[in-house]
């Protein structure tokens, strides 16, 4: 209930609270991202609905780590809601294109099916321009089932947040 959490996260005049969107960067034999945040495709009006602070974005964070979008080899999706998958694509000449030009994207097939066939309760969270262009570009490796998808990286369907949300386990 709001009475419990509002002392720690007071809402603004539009009843929004400050939230962070964190991607996970893994560096080793490959350079990987788990999720990519909301991206930069939303209009100022759309971003304002959620109160997104666009002063710093994923490109800034990659640059701070000495990287660019071209350095990412693998992107793994926990699920395809816009605040996790919005950064998978960027606009180029009015078309959504893969944001990470040298990456393969690992997406759970059943999550993709749900995202491309949303129902009344979840359609506001799935935006096709975040993932359909990846399939069209041939850069998606669909995940079927649970287990290791790369050496030291396993995925497990947990459901809950979305029907096919997955946990990503990292072992090193």
Would you name each region that the model predicts?
Residues 35, 79, 161:
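Conserved G/P- and acidic residue-centered "switch" motifs that form tight phosphate/ATP-binding loops
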Residues 53-67, 71-83, 99-157, 162:
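Metallo-beta-lactamase
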